């Protein structure tokens, strides 16, 4: 590990909950790392959404296709998809291999490699560098070459953890959808300024307060 790097340890596949919804909750407070020859970019994941089996908004809903095969890999693989012809979205496969489910990484609090991140998003305030799924991929240099990448490899683009205490997790409905909008499948870090979407949505529907992981 280079001097002064955060003590982020790679997540192993066995660390990941198999259930899609539990995986989306579990990933709040974990880290996305992109190691490059010029340095490391990393940040804490503060917002995710679950797209479980049977969800009609999931890209895997109609079964395996040439463009969505990464969603059917073992848990912890990247599924990178261009959305609306504008932005790439970074998803992670969930459930057992060949099931077809995943979670979307929606927002990150950038922590390491800020000059590298800011070079990809010039003139953008820190809060908005990776606040939203399209901004996230631009900020962290994630494109189609990472589709199918093993995020549990600890190399290149990977997910990790820093051992710390219990992390609070809020849950609300997903945003930006035209159907299946009312299920509580969006998870976030309460109080984080880096979470996307309207502030009024950041309340747990069941209790009016964030849950804990």
Curated annotation (Swiss-Prot):
The keyword Hydrolase applies. Keywords: DNA damage, DNA repair, Hydrolase. Pfam families: Pur_DNA_glyco. One of its GO terms (molecular function) is alkylbase DNA N-glycosylase activity. NCBIfam families: 3mg. Belongs to the DNA glycosylase MPG family. It is an enzyme of class 3 (hydrolase). GO terms for biological process: base-excision repair. Its EC number is 3.2.2.-. InterPro entries: Formyl_transferase-like_C_sf, MPG, MPG_sf. This is Putative 3-methyladenine DNA glycosylase. It comes from Paraburkholderia phytofirmans (strain DSM 17436 / LMG 22146 / PsJN).
């Amino acid at each position: 590990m280079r001097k002064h790097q955060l003590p982020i340890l790679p997540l192993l596949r066995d660390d990941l909950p198999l259930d899609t919804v539990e995986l989306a909750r579990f990933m709040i407070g974990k880290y996305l790392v992109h190691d490059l020859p010029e340095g490391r970019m990393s940040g804490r994941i503060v917002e995710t959404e679950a797209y479980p089996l049977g969800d009609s908004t999931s890209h895997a809903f109609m079964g395996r296709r040439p463009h969505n095969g990464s969603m059917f890999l073992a848990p912890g693989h990247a599924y990178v998809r261009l959305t609306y012809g504008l932005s790439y979205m970074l998803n992670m496969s969930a459930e057992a291999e060949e099931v077809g489910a995943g979670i979307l990484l929606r927002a990150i609090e950038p922590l390491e490699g800020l000059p590298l991140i800011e070079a990809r998003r010039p003139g953008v305030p820190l809060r908005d560098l990776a606040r939203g799924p399209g901004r996230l991929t631009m900020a962290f240099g994630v494109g189609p070459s990472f589709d199918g990448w093993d995020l549990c490899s600890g190399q290149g683009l990977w997910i990790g953890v820093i051992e710390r205490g219990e992390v609070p997790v809020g849950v609300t409905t997903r945003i930006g959808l035209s159907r299946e909008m009312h299920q509580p499948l969006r998870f976030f870090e309460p109080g984080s300024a880096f979470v996307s979407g309207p502030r009024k949505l950041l309340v747990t529907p069941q209790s009016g307060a964030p849950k804990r992981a």
